[in-house]
Amino acid sequence: MYMKKPAIPDDVIERVQQGKCTKEDALLLLEGNPFELFELANKLRASTVGDVVSYVVNRNIYITNKCVGTCGFCAYRTDEGYILSIEEILKQTEEAREAGAVEVCVQGGYTPEADMEFYLEIIEAIKSGFPDICIHALSPMEVNYAAGLSGMSVEDALRKLKKCGLDSLTGTSAEILSDRVRKIICPGKITTQQWVDTVTAAHRAGISTNSTIMYGHVETLEERLDHVFTIREIQKETGGISELIPMSFLPYNNPIGEKMMASGKFTSTGLEDLQLIAISRIILHTHVNNIQATWVKLGKKLAQFALQCGANDLGGTLMEDQISTASGGSYGEYVSPAEFEWMIKGAGRVPIQRDTLYRKVEPRLPASEGLLPGYVKPKMGSKE
């Protein structure tokens, strides 16, 4: 027999509305009726950003798949891979610009060939050639590794990146901000405190960041929540975080996922995905305004439904996503502006295009134009 769960207590709602949700509140909300959780998150979304849903016309540029990391969730890295030349990077940026992009997201593995001078040259070349393109690049891990190779401090590296034209640092390499979890899934990566220190140093240097959480593997529910509360604490200190992107773990073609599936455990369910989006909106209310439902992880239909659960952004056109595809992602690598508009309007919302920093931009091309799904990806870069 179905037992109706009690309504959300008034004192919890009051704390949430004040931006003071506690961990105990969050656990209580997750134990309750999920549809009441979604409704609360949706109301907070409406009061914060209204009925506007944003997306960005962008392109991922994967500069290298070489990596000395030992992350157990990664199927992307190879010992013998490619490194794009400056010319290849600029060519891909030009293709993106011609397709109406306002952002390039530059990412890859970390490798001894890529010191800080390597990244500074890339950032400067892109900004010089395409000053109207936002450069969203490097992770806190890459900054730490490359700065170490070049014998400079993280703070100096960030100042140089800012001077060369970096607009935003990616909030990836966060995974789960728990050292217990990190020792299992990415033992060679920076610690939780190093990640926090790098992000706050970026904000002090005038560089915005987003934030991410990669969940659905070995972490506990409380560790997920602790992660989101850590993001809140950073934001209270610096105000430099533009968004949170919850990313569900893809368990295919990687050691962590294979071990999970062999034991009968799979990644997060659709309900868990929506609950995390909702509770993130609730915890971060009055602090981080933007919660993304990333279609490349959730699929287009679940991402659209997440707009009823606290999300207000659908991410980017991407044009390619080698990392998700390598780990079994099956939702494609490109969504056209026209399809984003259709998804958003179908949810009863108002679509807008934005840039990296969540500033509204006028479309550079009509939504019906630009790069179409028949787009042929360029070949990978030159072998080293």
From Swiss-Prot:
Q: Which residues form the Radical SAM core domain?
A: 53-286
- Show the coiled coil region(s): none
Query: Which cofactor is recorded for it?
Result: [4Fe-4S] cluster
Q: Which UniProt keywords apply?
A: 4Fe-4S, Iron, Iron-sulfur, Metal-binding, S-adenosyl-L-methionine, Transferase
**What does the record give as EC number?**
2.5.1.147
Identify the pathway.
Cofactor biosynthesis; coenzyme F0 biosynthesis
- Signal peptide span: none
* Record note on cofactor: Binds 1 [4Fe-4S] cluster. The cluster is coordinated with 3 cysteines and an exchangeable S-adenosyl-L-methionine.
Example GO molecular function term? Answer: 7,8-didemethyl-8-hydroxy-5-deazariboflavin synthase activity
Disulphide connectivity of cysteines: none
One Pfam match, given by its short name, reads Radical_SAM
Q: Which reaction does it catalyse?
A: 5-amino-6-(D-ribitylamino)uracil + L-tyrosine + S-adenosyl-L-methionine = 5-amino-5-(4-hydroxybenzyl)-6-(D-ribitylimino)-5,6-dihydrouracil + 2-iminoacetate + 5'-deoxyadenosine + L-methionine + H(+)
UniProt-annotated binding residues for [4Fe-4S] cluster: 67, 71, 74
What superkingdom heads the lineage? Archaea
* UniProt KW Metal-binding keyword: yes
Q: Which SMART domains match?
A: Elp3
Q: How does it assemble?
A: Consists of two subunits, CofG and CofH.
Q: What does this protein do, in the record's words?
A: Catalyzes the radical-mediated synthesis of 5-amino-5-(4-hydroxybenzyl)-6-(D-ribitylimino)-5,6-dihydrouracil from 5-amino-6-(D-ribitylamino)uracil and L-tyrosine.
Cited HAMAP family: FO_synth_sub2
**Family from the record:** Belongs to the radical SAM superfamily. CofH family.
Q: What is this protein called?
A: 5-amino-6-(D-ribitylamino)uracil--L-tyrosine 4-hydroxyphenyl transferase 2
Q: Which gene encodes it?
A: cofH2
